[in-house]
Regions:
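Residue-level detector of alpha-helix initiation sites
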Residues: 11-12, 255, 382
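Conserved beta-strand-loop-beta-strand element in the redox core of flavoprotein oxidoreductases
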Residues: 201-243
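Flavin (FAD/FMN) cofactor-binding core of flavoprotein oxidoreductases
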Residues: 117-121, 147-152, 269-270, 325-404, ...
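Glycine-rich FAD pyrophosphate-binding loop
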Residues: 23-44
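A conserved short coil-to-beta-strand element within the FAD-binding core of flavoproteins
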Residues: 146-147, 152, 172, 196-211
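N-terminal Rossmann-like FAD-binding beta1-loop-alpha1 element of flavoenzymes
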Residues: 3-30
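Active-site substrate-recognition segment that forms the wall
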Residues: 38-49, 53, 58-75, 108, ...
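Rossmann-like flavin
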Residues: 74-186
Length: 416
C-alpha cells in the first residue's frame, strides 16, 4: 500500500515536491491557503535559473542587527560541507529542470544563457580570485572579456561601463509561475490532489502517523459548486476544522512553517521587488532587451528574458519575519535603462514583490525536521529558482528511503 503524504504550500517548492513524490508512487495531497499555485513568493520572484556561486553575493544587503548576528554564528557552524553540497545540488537542480521540460513538454518561456556583469577592474579582480574555487566545486564558470559579453548580449547599452563578465554554463531564465502551473497538471495526472483555500492549522503525531488539522477558508467571492472552474480545482469543502491522517508531511510554506513545526526556526523575511513588461519590438532593431539572463551585483539587479517579456528584479532586503518593505520600483526601471535602454513598453508594466523565508546563513533548509514524519523544503530563494527542482527530487528520494542523487545532510535544520 502506498504511503500518503501531505504537502503544505503550493508555491513552486510545493508543486515540484508534490510532482516528485507522486512520480515515486506516493499518494499526495497539497494544501494551499491561496486560490492557485505560485500565487505568493513564486509569483513575483526573479526569473533566473542560476547556479550557486559562493562568495559572489554581497553580504551587506540591508538587514536587521539580529539577522546579521545569526548569520555570523551560522556561518561559523556551516563549514565547507554545506557549500560543496549546495554546489552539487545546484548542478543537479538545473539538470533536473531541463529534464522535466523535455520529458513532460513543459514550456515556461525559457531562455538559455546567464552573464554576471563586472562593471570595473576591482570587481573583475575579485571574481577572478574566486574562479579557481568555483571550478574546484564543479561549477562551470568562465570569465569573459567585455567585448565577448556584448557579442552575447547585443542589446547592452554601449555607453554602460563594463570591465568583464562571468558566463555561467547551464544558467538561464524562465517563467517560474508558468512552470508551476504546468507541473501541477502533470502531478495531478499522477494522482496528486490540490486543495486550495485550505489552511493547515496544526500537525501532530498520533502514533500511527501525522494528524493534520485543516480548514476550508474560502474568500467571500469564492465560486459555488455550479460555477465554471479549471479542471482539478478544489471544490468547496465542509466548513470548520477537519482532521486527516497522513504518513508524512512536507512543509513548503516558507515563513509560516515554524507555526506548524512547533519549534523556533531562525527565519527572516527576504523581500525582492520585480517589474515585468513586454519587450519592445521595433523593425530594424532586433536586439532590444536581453537574450537570456543578465545580473549586475553592484546594483543588486537581475534582468531576464521570458518569452516576449522582460523581468527586472532586485532590491533584496532582509527584515524580521513579519515586517513589510516598500519596494523601490524606480530603481529597477533605472537599472533596466542603464543596461538595456528602450527595450520594454513601460505603459504595460506589472509590478510585484516576493516575500520569502531566509535562513540565518542564507542556505536552504532541506530534509528531516527532527520531528518524526515531518520534512522541510524551505528557504530556496535569493538567486531565482535554480535550486527548486533538484531540492524536490532529492527530498522525495529521502522520504522514499532511497539513496539521494546528492548528499544534503549539511543543509538540514539541525545545523542552525
Amino acid at each position: 500500500m502506498s504511503r500518503s503524504i501531505a504537502v503544505v504550500g503550493a508555491g513552486l517548492a510545493g508543486v515540484t515536491t508534490a510532482y516528485e513524490l507522486a512520480a515515486l508512487g506516493f499518494q499526495v495531497q497539497v494544501f494551499e491557503r491561496g486560490g492557485s499555485v505560485a500565487e505568493q513568493a513564486s509569483f513575483a520572484s526573479s526569473a533566473l535559473l542560476s547556479p550557486f556561486l559562493p562568495g559572489l553575493a554581497d553580504a551587506s544587503a540591508p538587514a536587521p542587527l539580529g539577522f546579521r548576528l545569526r548569520r555570523w554564528r551560522a556561518g561559523r557552524k556551516g563549514g565547507d560541507d554545506a557549500v560543496s553540497q549546495l554546489a552539487a545540488l545546484s548542478r543537479l537542480s538545473l539538470a533536473r529542470t531541463t529534464e522535466l521540460r523535455h520529458e513532460l513538454g513543459l514550456d515556461d518561456e525559457a531562455s538559455d544563457g546567464l552573464l554576471i556583469a563586472l562593471a570595473d577592474a576591482k570587481r573583475t579582480a575579485a571574481a577572478e580570485a574566486l574562479l579557481e574555487g568555483w571550478q574546484a566545486l564543479g561549477l562551470q564558470v568562465e570569465l569573459i572579456e567585455a567585448g565577448e559579453a556584448r557579442l552575447r548580449e547585443p542589446g547592452l547599452n554601449a555607453d554602460a561601463p563594463l570591465s568583464a563578465a562571468l558566463a555561467l554554463a547551464h544558467g538561464g531564465a524562465g517563467n517560474a509561475r508558468l512552470f508551476a502551473q504546468q507541473l501541477r497538471l502533470q502531478a495531478q495526472r499522477l494522482g496528486a490532489g490540490f486543495r486550495f483555500h485550505t489552511t493547515v492549522r496544526a500537525i501532530a503525531a498520533d502514533g500511527a502517523g501525522l494528524m493534520l488539522r485543516h480548514e476550508y477558508t474560502p474568500p467571500a467571492e469564492a465560486p459555488t459548486r455550479s460555477a465554471e472552474r479549471e479542471a482539478g480545482d478544489t471544490l468547496p469543502q465542509p466548513l470548520g476544522p477537519q482532521d486527516e491522517r497522513f504518513d508524512a508531511a512536507v512543509l513548503c510554506n516558507g515563513l509560516d512553517a515554524p507555526t506548524l513545526l512547533g519549534e523556533r526556526l531562525p527565519l527572516s523575511a527576504q523581500h525582492e521587488a520585480s517589474v515585468t513588461a513586454p519587450l519592445r519590438l521595433v523593425e530594424g532593431y532586433p536586439d532590444l532587451g536581453p537574450k537570456a539572463g543578465w545580473v549586475d551585483p553592484s546594483r543588486d539587479l537581475s534582468v531576464a528574458r521570458a518569452g516576449q517579456r522582460v523581468r527586472v528584479s532586485g532590491g533584496l532586503t532582509v527584515t524580521d519575519a513579519r515586517a513589510r518593505v516598500n519596494p523601490d520600483y524606480e530603481a529597477l526601471h533605472r537599472g533596466l535603462q542603464h543596461w538595456f535602454p528602450g527595450s520594454v513598453l513601460h505603459q504595460q508594466v506589472q509590478q510585484g514583490q516576493a516575500r520569502r523565508a531566509m535562513s540565518a546563513d542564507g542556505l536552504p533548509l532541506l530534509g528531516a525536521s527532527g520531528r518524526p514524519g515531518l520534512w522541510l523544503n524551505l528557504s530556496l530563494g535569493g538567486q531565482g529558482w535554480g535550486l527548486t527542482c533538484g531540492s524536490a527530487q532529492v527530498l522525495a528520494q529521502l522520504i522514499a528511503g532511497q539513496a539521494p542523487a546528492v548528499d544534503i545532510a549539511a543543509l538540514g535544520p539541525q545545523r542552525l
